[in-house]
Amino acid sequence: MLNRLRRTKIVATLGPSTDINNNLEKIIRSGVNVLRFNFSHGSKDEHKSRANQAREIMTRLNFHIALLGDLQGPKIRISKFIKNNIFLNVGDFFILDANLDQNNGNQERVGIDYKQLPYDLKVGDVLLLDDGRIQLKVIKSTGHEILTKVVIGGILSNNKGINKLGGGLSADALTEKDKKDIILATEINVDYLAISFPRCSNDLKQARKLAKEFGSNAKIIAKIERAEAVLNQNTIEDIILASDAIMIARGDLGVEIGDSELAGIQKKLIRTARQLNRIVITATQMMESMITNPLPTRAEVMDVANAVLDGSDAVMLSAETASGEYPAETVIKMAKICKGAEKVPSINVSRHRIHAKFDDIEEAIAMSAMYVANHLKGITAIITMTESGKTALMTSRITSGLPIFALSKNKETLNLASLYRGVTPIYFNSKNNNFKAANEAIVLLRKRGFLCRGELVIITQGDIMGKIGKTNTSRILKVV
């Protein structure tokens, strides 16, 4: 192996900053693996234009990068103030009024966009506005009005979000806007579709069904950001199993469960997702200071590194690339942090499912290949010749410290695999089967500079190339 490859993937959000100065191509060249379209912001035409530009760059550079559409979901917000903002003092009484015109907020009251909110609350509940910067205690909730008392005050401006401490708001996971955005996601052919604020597995099943009805085959990502979603281990597992991947959206989740609980929940979610053979993205404020600064803080470096050490498939950038001043520099710095953390030996050994029995042949082959990778001296790489990408995904659930090359002629499969930890997707289209195809794969990777003569590699493949679900062979070959 000539160069150590970065195993943890980087998700970057597109926005005004990537629209200028050739920044989209710069972040792609800097190492982005997934491009995120945040449907909370931007117009339909802007998203389509960015998708077209991204595909042109990917084709020209011969890069395999996944597109991720992120639905806004039922984010509950206050309306607008006549003077754009107010200052709330501790002890003030303040009314949230479901019937107030959306532009008529004042020092005493403001409108809300979720008319059901007064019926979801009881006396004593605590509402968290603007990511918890403002806290209101419910004194009375009747009809269309919620009378509150300010517990933590400060400046409150237009359209700030509302959360309930401990969760429990009944808004549906998919709004009418989300349904329109699923159509948009289908039109730009995203590989992944992120569902915001799911409370249970049924929310994800409904989203998957709706996406398929609109013609999308996108894999479903569950954004974990409600307290109900992490209520207990059974709920966590149900949500993970109903999705193809999860995103730990630490902003709203931290507001609802409390920041002090966040670190433990993050580790539990990552561990559980990997055990259940699902992908996991860690997100929110990872390199926040680089929105306006050319270097991250030491705390941000440690945050990214810890997400890598926890086993995240990917770490995500939001405003850092969408509206920040240093989008490419942020990606470069994050990539360096990931590679630095990946040097730690303790994360390169895994006993995951070492004693498990399998009903699925592909999974058994993947597990056996990774067992050999961790126990036979001299192995330098794992090569999975795959149609659907399933074998590549399964092998990536076992930590070995070795690169996994997913070889396929299916470009959609290669795009999906760009999110899998430790997996490098490579286009490969052989007319041969078995041993000849395996040797062709080795020659290709050696010519690309990934392998050296004399190294040992593990190859998984099926007897017949081009058939989904037919992986039944694992072999060890020497690079010549």
UniProtKB/Swiss-Prot annotation:
It comes from the Bacteria. K(+) binds at residues 38, 40, 70. The record marks 223 as: Transition state stabilizer. SUPFAM superfamilies: Phosphoenolpyruvate/pyruvate domain (SSF51621), PK beta-barrel domain-like (SSF50800), PK C-terminal domain-like (SSF52935). Its cofactor is Mg(2+); K(+). Substrate binds at residues 36, 251-252, 284. Its EC number is 2.7.1.40. Signal peptide: none annotated. Mg(2+) binds at residues 225, 252. Pathway: Carbohydrate degradation; glycolysis; pyruvate from D-glyceraldehyde 3-phosphate: step 5/5. It catalyses: pyruvate + ATP = phosphoenolpyruvate + ADP + H(+). It is an enzyme of class 2 (transferase). Homotetramer. NCBIfam families: PRK05826.1 (NF004491), pyruv_kin (TIGR01064). PANTHER family: PYRUVATE KINASE. Belongs to the pyruvate kinase family. This is Pyruvate kinase. It comes from Buchnera aphidicola subsp. Acyrthosiphon pisum (strain APS). The gene is pykA.
